């Protein structure tokens, strides 16, 4: 109710930071799980040179336990990456969850509703502990090299957010791909024990 809205406050948190092959990666900290999963996967790739599907699959499997209970299966997630002429950079991910079902006046803005998201809160609206923030796997991320911004990235895609970012970073940093190549390259994703692999160049259609 209104009392809950009045009692809400924005928390500014210190990002997680990790070096990886000459790059410095900043991502979101707990209680969100996405950043932790990404850095855990990159740690497993830190001794690798160029990586392929097998190495990335192993990294995803190592990261997965951190987020198995925190994956969101709904859409309505938007990501923005912004940089200005002074090299100020921002990476912003927002999500509506299942939506609150009401708009704010005539703004067209709908508040989010993560308590209605069954993967995050399987026991229903009123089961979540009071005054405790619900976690998420969204993971806005910044990449720097020699103190200069290289990349701002994040993703929509609910449970595929973390794997998409890991694949992009592995292609960019480990494989030396351009940013365009790193983003558009085929990706791996592991969910519920199933490995999903986008087709590589030259693969034909497989029936059955």
Predicted regions and their residues:
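Accessory "access/gating" subregions that flank catalytic or transport cores
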Residues: 1-31
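Proteins synthesized as precursors that undergo proteolytic processing into mature forms
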Residues: 31-69, 75-208
């Amino acid at each position: 109710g209104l009392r809950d809205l009045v009692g809400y406050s924005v928390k500014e948190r210190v990002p997680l930071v990790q070096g990886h092959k000459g790059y410095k990666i900043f991502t979101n900290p707990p209680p969100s799980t996405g950043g932790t999963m990404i850095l855990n996967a990159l740690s497993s790739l830190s001794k690798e040179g160029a990586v392929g599907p097998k190495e990335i699959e192993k990294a995803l499997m190592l990261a997965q336990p951190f987020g198995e209970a925190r994956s969101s299966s709904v859409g309505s997630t938007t990501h923005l990456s912004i940089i200005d002429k002074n090299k100020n950079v921002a990476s912003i991910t927002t999500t509506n969850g299942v939506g609150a079902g009401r708009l704010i006046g005539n703004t067209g803005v709908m508040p989010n509703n993560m308590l209605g998201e069954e993967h995050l809160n399987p026991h229903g609206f009123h089961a979540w502990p009071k005054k405790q923030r619900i976690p998420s796997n969204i993971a806005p991320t910044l990449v720097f090299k020699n103190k200069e911004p290289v990349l701002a990235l994040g993703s929509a895609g609910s449970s595929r957010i973390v794997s998409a970012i890991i694949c992009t970073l592995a292609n960019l940093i480990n494989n030396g791909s351009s940013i365009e190549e790193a983003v558009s390259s085929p990706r791996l994703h592991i969910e519920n024990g199933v490995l999903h692999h986008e087709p590589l160049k030259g693969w034909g259609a497989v029936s059955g």
